[in-house]
Swiss-Prot record:
Gene: OR5AR1
Source organism (scientific name): Homo sapiens
Record-given protein name: Olfactory receptor 5AR1
Membrane topology: Multi-pass membrane protein
Major localization class: membrane
One Pfam assignment: 7tm_4
Stretches assigned to the Extracellular side: 1-28, 80-100, 161-205, 261-271
Spans traversing the lipid bilayer: 29-49, 59-79, 101-120, 140-160, 206-226, 240-260, 272-292
């Protein structure tokens, strides 16, 4: 039967990560632990930063927002994924699919700009330390974060409109574990050429603009570090930037692999595991990446634990 002659889709069925019932139980346990670590880590980071006055600085303000967006986009995906591991009826309505998609896209794209703002903050701290209080004032920090969330909102509306204005009238089986752009485009019975161009252009703009900010910031930072006479100063600068560079590499590497390529090169199995990595694993890793070697966060944690034990 031609797709055009089929009835319109009102719900989708996820194939999930695996069809093996035993593996589903194993994956449920593993990803439940990962998600709980994610939730505890990111909420813990938010609580530490908001309650400890020593962490009321631009760098930790941005880190608090990073934890929030990490928690946001992982929570748009993980609870549903965990529930689907325990059932054979992996059905999601068209409207619920659009809602899941919208929240996921909004938080992920906001994270791109939060990471760019963090790079700018490090640039000012290392390259313009005498002007730090001016360039990174409370008003500037708030404006940067509001701009990040506004960019996420605009992207949310654009992506959701472009993706869900397409016709879905043939198979309703999504070979994935959540509603994501590539499998939805592959499923549509519309001509997706224009939508693909617009969607990938928007993704490309978000990626390019934020990576450009990060690249320029770290180019100036690298030059400043090379010019430092003190080995201790260079070590401190590298320590300040190391965790952020690790987080950027993990996040952008996976997102670029997922979205900045045509659907003709789309590999279902590869992309499922890439999606698992950046929807579940990276949000869990970020609190660890940014806190393990951070003396201020460790001190705040010990202080908080000390207060509760008294």
């Amino acid at each position: 039967m031609d797709k055009e002659n089929s009835s319109m889709v009102t719900e989708f069925i996820f194939m999930g990560i695996t069809q093996d019932p035993q593996m589903e139980i194993i994956f449920f346990v593993v990803f439940l632990i990962v998600y709980l670590v994610n939730v505890v880590g990111n909420i813990g980071m938010i609580i530490l930063i908001t309650t400890d006055t020593q962490l009321h600085t631009p760098m930790y303000f941005f880190l608090c927002n990073l934890s929030f967006v990490d928690l946001g986009y992982s929570s748009a995906i993980a609870p549903r994924m965990l529930a689907d591991f325990l059932t054979n009826h992996k059905v999601i309505s068209f409207s619920s699919c659009a809602t899941q998609f919208a929240f996921f896209v909004g938080f992920v794209d906001a994270e791109c700009y939060v990471l760019a703002a963090m790079a700018y903050g490090r640039f000012v701290a290392i390259c313009r330390p005498l002007h730090y209080s001016t360039f990174m004032s409370k008003q500037v920090c708030l404006a940067l974060m509001l701009g990040s969330y506004l960019a996420g909102l605009v992207s949310l509306v654009a992506h959701t409109t472009l993706t869900f204005s397409l016709s879905y009238c043939g198979s309703n089986i999504i070979n994935h574990f959540f509603c994501e752009i590539p499998p939805l485009l592959a499923l549509s019975c519309s001509d997706t050429y224009i939508s693909e161009i617009l969607l990938f252009s928007l993704c490309g703009f978000i990626e390019f603009s934020t990576i450009l900010i990060i690249f320029i910031s770290y180019t100036f930072i690298l030059v400043a570090i090379i010019r430092m006479r003190s080995a201790e100063g260079r070590l401190k600068a590298f320590s300040t930037c190391g965790s952020h560079l690790t987080g950027i590499t993990l996040f952008y590497g996976t997102v670029m692999f997922m979205y900045l390529r045509p659907t003709s090169s789309y590999s279902l199995d590869q992309d499922k595991w890439a999606s698992v990595f950046y929807t579940v694993i990276i949000p869990m890793l970020n609190p660890l990446i940014y806190s393990l070697r951070n003396k201020d966060v460790k001190a705040a944690f010990k202080k908080l634990i000390g207060k509760k034990s008294q």
